[in-house]
């Protein structure tokens, strides 16, 4: 049992030496918001994969099992939350499913937040064999699921061309056993805004997310971590958690874009200038100012 009431998270996802994706995007905000975070890195790369040269290595299953075994043997395997993101192999996802069940033996009330990282904008960047493992093994174990539009469509097999399609996708995910479904970003035809959606207990909320004309990496990882945090801190008030998450994310993205554009007035901005400015926005993470309100749609 934990020695105090501090929430404790085990986060299993990617790691980069430079920049902010995976655990580098998730751990700092969670710590700033008062969570103890232990992290296991499914990959360790020098940078994220939008850079020209990729160096690093992948954690294999035996190594992951050994790390978890050490936590168990030393009796430091009590967690309130479990967060997963990018993983490159179906076997590693199956191992993660075993870890979830193991952690729930220690804490039956463990909250599992699953970010089913598979791709974006119609393109997969993990092996196709990962999809059925997410769909059939991990998603049914999740308390909170935070896919983007493409990932939600892959998992359910339902296209999402409008709000009705999005609601069908959400209901299908609920039917698969997920208590809280959060679509981190959907493009439903609005030229100016993406739409964020959150649904739990028969209530669904939507919130506009103004588009920023640049490509950022690590925003989904940050979204999942923030939603985990604010769900806990608001007593599972999904509307407020969504508003706080979007307020934080949008402030960081806009600040990152404006800073990058100041040194690149025209053309595409190189990846090293669009790394999320998390440290510079520590106060935003601690106390986000809500400017965009979520609206109940059913």
UniProtKB/Swiss-Prot annotation:
Binding site for pyridoxal 5'-phosphate: 47, 125, 220-221
Record-listed Na(+) binding positions: 115, 146
Major subcellular location class: cytoplasm
Positions annotated to bind Mg(2+): 120
Gene Ontology molecular function, alphabetical: ATP binding; metal ion binding; pyridoxal kinase activity
Top enzyme category: transferase
Cofactor note: Divalent metal cations. Zn(2+) is the most effective cation for catalysis.
Entry keyword ATP-binding: yes
One cellular component term from this protein's GO annotations in UniProt: cytosol
Location of the active site: 221
Residues annotated as binding pyridoxal: 14, 47
Subunit structure: Homodimer.
Protein name (record): Pyridoxal kinase
Organism: Bombyx mori (Silk moth)
């Amino acid at each position: 049992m934990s020695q105090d009431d501090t929430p404790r998270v085990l986060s299993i996802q990617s790691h980069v030496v430079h920049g902010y994706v995976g655990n580098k995007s998730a751990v700092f905000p969670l710590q700033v918001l008062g969570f103890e975070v232990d992290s296991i890195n499914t990959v360790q790369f020098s940078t994220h994969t939008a850079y020209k040269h990729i160096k690093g290595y992948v954690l294999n299953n035996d190594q992951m099992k050994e790390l978890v075994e050490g936590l168990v043997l030393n009796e430091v395997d009590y967690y309130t939350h479990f967060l997963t993101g990018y993983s490159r192999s179906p076997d590693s996802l199956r191992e993660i499913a075993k870890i979830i069940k193991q952690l729930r033996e220690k804490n039956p009330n463990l909250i599992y937040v699953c970010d089913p990282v598979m791709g974006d904008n119609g393109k997969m960047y993990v092996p196709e064999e990962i999809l059925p493992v997410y769909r059939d093994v991990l998603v049914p174990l999740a308390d909170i699921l935070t896919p983007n539009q493409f990932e939600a469509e892959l998992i359910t097999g339902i296209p999402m061309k409008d709000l009705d399609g999005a609601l069908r996708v959400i209901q299908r995910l609920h039917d698969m056993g997920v208590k809280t479904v959060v679509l981190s970003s959907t493009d439903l035809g609005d030229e100016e805004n993406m739409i964020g959606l959150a649904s739990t207990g028969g209530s669904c909320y939507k919130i506009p997310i103004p588009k920023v004309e640049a490509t950022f990496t690590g925003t989904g990882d940050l979204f999942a971590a923030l939603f985990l945090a604010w769900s806990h801190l608001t007593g599972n008030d999904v509307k407020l958690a969504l508003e706080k998450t979007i307020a934080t994310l949008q402030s960081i993205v806009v600040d990152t874009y404006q800073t990058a554009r100041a040194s690149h007035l025209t053309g595409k901005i190189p990846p090293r200038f669009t790394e999320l400015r998390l440290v510079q926005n520590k106060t935003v993470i601690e106390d986000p100012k809500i400017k965009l309100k979520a609206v109940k749609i059913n």
